[in-house]
Regions:
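Adenosine-nucleotide cofactor-binding segment
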Residues: 162-190
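Short internal beta-strands
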Residues: 145-156
Length: 311
């Protein structure tokens, strides 16, 4: 299996070794933060092996979350090092050896607070959300984002990506496993930090989602948890609801059940047609998705026990 970094500016595993623990008078408490992800078939002792290795590497474990679903193991570890304790070569080499021994995929992503976040946009064919995000990029409203590419299972939105001078990647999605493998390879090559689903109309597998835990933002056309699924506007219209809304949320392995980041709604006027409802909803979708992306980029979201708190 493999181990590597997806953080721009940091390179792949195999960084310059630590410089020793001499006292640095100008910054005596400088720390480096990283996220480690572990994915593979479940087996005994994985958590112990990883945490013991991090202890030997003088890492401080800030948070750890692991789960097993249908025999598939995933773990995310938030770690930090004092500047003088971090030997990137040793950490990278050790994680690579553990990945091979455990037959798992292990990745480490270092976080640089001042670096812009590499963003991938995924969309299918509806342009309204993608155009709103691209417009915000052009106007400078998303200065903390570093837009890297637009990825789609169709080609309708390619001209819009090209007009914004972003690479457009087309991946057919008839075979989900193969498509996701290709998409993950592209995202890794572009060193993506987080993903925005601007009306991407394909369901992502747990194998994909686990690699970007709380780093995939989706917009859904209903006030979740009401009306999940692809026909939310029609369901709301047929049931005669008086208020219709949209929800931006993190993507999890359970469809439309991820932690909710932001919501907005509008009143349904008498005699309003389904077409009019969809048009009004799409405006809210674009605005609410952009709001969620801004909150994420400004690190104002705290996810705890499946809920999001704005900080």
């Amino acid at each position: 299996m493999r181990t590597g970094s997806s953080e721009p500016g940091m390179g792949r595993l195999g960084w310059t070794a630590g410089r020793g623990c001499g006292v640095r008078m100008h910054d005596p408490v400088m720390r480096h933060f990283a996220t480690i992800t572990v994915i593979g078939r479940d087996k005994t002792g994985v958590v112990a092996r990883i945490t013991n290795f991090l202890f030997l590497q003088k890492a401080n474990i800030e948070a750890l979350e692991e789960q097993v679903t249908r025999g598939q193991f995933s773990m995310t570890v938030q770690t930090s090092w004092k500047d003088c304790d971090l030997d990137r070569n040793a950490v990278g080499r050790g994680l690579g050896e553990l990945a091979a021994e455990l037959e798992m995929e292990i990745k480490i992503r270092f976080t640089e607070p001042r670096r812009r976040q590499r963003m991938a946009l995924m969309a299918t064919r509806e342009p309204h959300c993608l155009e709103r995000i691209l417009g915000a990029i052009k106007s400078g409203a998303l200065k903390k984002a570093d837009p890297a590419l637009v990825l789609s299972n169709r080609r309708e939105l390619e001209p819009r990506a090209r007009a914004s001078r972003l690479p457009f990647v087309h991946i057919p999605w008839e075979d989900r496993a193969r498509a996701e493998q290709q998409a993950l390879r592209v995202l890794d090559e572009h060193e993506i930090d987080f993903i925005v689903l601007a009306r991407f109309m394909k369901i992502l597998s747990p194998n994909f989602v686990w690699r970007f835990k709380n780093k995939i933002i989706n917009i859904h056309p209903s006030l979740l948890p009401s009306f999940p699924g692809p026909q939310a506007y029609r369901q709301a219209y047929e049931q005669g609801v008086k208020i219709i809304g949209v929800s931006a949320h993190f993507v999890t392995m359970n469809l439309d059940e991820g932690p909710i980041i932001a919501q907005d709604c509008f009143a349904v006027r008498p005699q309003m047609t389904l077409k009019q409802i969809v048009a009004a909803g799409q405006k809210l979708e674009a605005a609410t998705l952009l709001k969620a992306v801004k909150l994420y980029l400004h690190k104002r979201l705290d996810v705890h026990w499946g809920t999001v708190k704005e900080v």
